[in-house]
Amino acid sequence: RDSSTSRGLGDVYKRQGNGDVVDGESAKAMYEQTGCDLVMIGRGSYGRPWVFRDVKHYLETGEKLPEVSIEEKMAVMKKHCELICKYKGERQGMKEARKNCAWYVKGLKGSARLRAQCGGLNTISDLYEMIDHILANELGE
């Protein structure tokens, strides 16, 4: 955990907390343990972009939001990859999207196999097929 000082606007200094912030509880602990002014979330958001919403809610209310469902997680992964492909083109976009997909499947049944499968995604259709298989496997269909 790090609480470093960086120069802000004018003569204002903001102490930033960074490291191992993955949810609201760890963000709150960072504030309390370091006395920082703000918390940065890095790898804790990989494959979990909703973590920012969850942390904000926890810090404001002290309540944890329910876990994101597998359907929601796959919908976000799909949209994320579609947006990458929209801006980069499908060929380059899917090359870049592979690493993101690997983060989204972390913790799912057979995640090691799924991460390897992510490395072979070449088209958006490949992604859709993988998502269908994940949902069928996770939901027992």
Predicted regions and their residues:
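Alpha/beta catalytic cores of nucleotide-metabolism and tRNA/nucleoside-modifying enzymes
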Residues: D11, R15-G17, V21-E141
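Single conserved hydrophobic/aromatic residue that forms the stacking wall/gate
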Residues: R1-Y13
